Design a protein with these regions (language model features):
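A conserved beta-strand element that flanks and buttresses the S-adenosyl-L-methionine
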Residues: 45
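Short catalytic micro-motifs in class I SAM-dependent methyltransferases
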Residues: 48-49, 57
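A short glycine-rich, Lys/Arg-flanked "PGG" loop and its adjoining helix->strand segment in the class I
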Residues: 56-71
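Conserved class I S-adenosyl-L-methionine
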Residues: 73-96
Length: 172
């Protein structure tokens, strides 16, 4: 596991102490300059971290340390839907986000760069109506509201999505 925050790594050690083995390492590092050899990893997973580094540097570092035929999986927020942009801006005004993070939030342009770099790339979009899921679940139950949300994810344009998942395979 890597993180730029030593405190975050300590929290992970505590939360997952029952699952740790000697092969699991915790390394404090910057994702823009990973301290690993070229072609070192078969799989890299990133959850919500793309907006915390220079997009171009992060893309190149992930590609560099991933083995040929290795897989990069990321889940993150998409910064295209105006509702979510306003929400993120309100968090910025409250001091919960930095301006640089807002500028680096993943968008379609960044997703195209990943697709171009990796070649073999699957992108799944979801959460177009996530903002209504909780209130709706109070009336029709979580399972039914989730079905409606999934249906709209398939019907609505991708720019309305809240989240995306990339599954990219490195092919030299």
């Amino acid at each position: 596991f890597t993180d730029i925050s030593g405190a975050s790594l300590e929290v992970m050690k505590i939360k997952f102490k029952d699952y740790l083995t000697s092969s699991i390492r915790f390394i404090k590092c910057n994702m823009e300059s990973l301290p690993f050899e070229k072609d070192e990893f078969d799989i890299i997973f990133c959850a919500g971290g793309l907006s915390y580094g220079n997009n171009f540097q992060v893309l190149n570092e992930i590609y560099r340390v991933l083995k040929n035929k290795g897989v990069f999986i990321v889940i993150d927020s998409l910064n295209e839907n105006p509702i979510y942009k306003i929400n993120r801006y309100l968090h910025f005004i409250k001091g919960n986000r930095t301006k640089s993070t807002l500028k680096r939030m993943p968008n379609f342009r960044l997703l195209k760069k990943y697709k171009y770099k990796f070649g073999s790339t699957l992108i799944i979009f979801s959460g177009a109506l996530i903002w209504i899921l909780h209130p709706l679940s109070k009336f029709i139950g979580y399972s039914n509201s989730r079905k409606i949300s999934d249906l709209f994810d398939n019907l609505l344009p991708n720019w309305m999505s809240f989240k995306f998942v990339i599954v990219a395979k490195k092919v030299k």
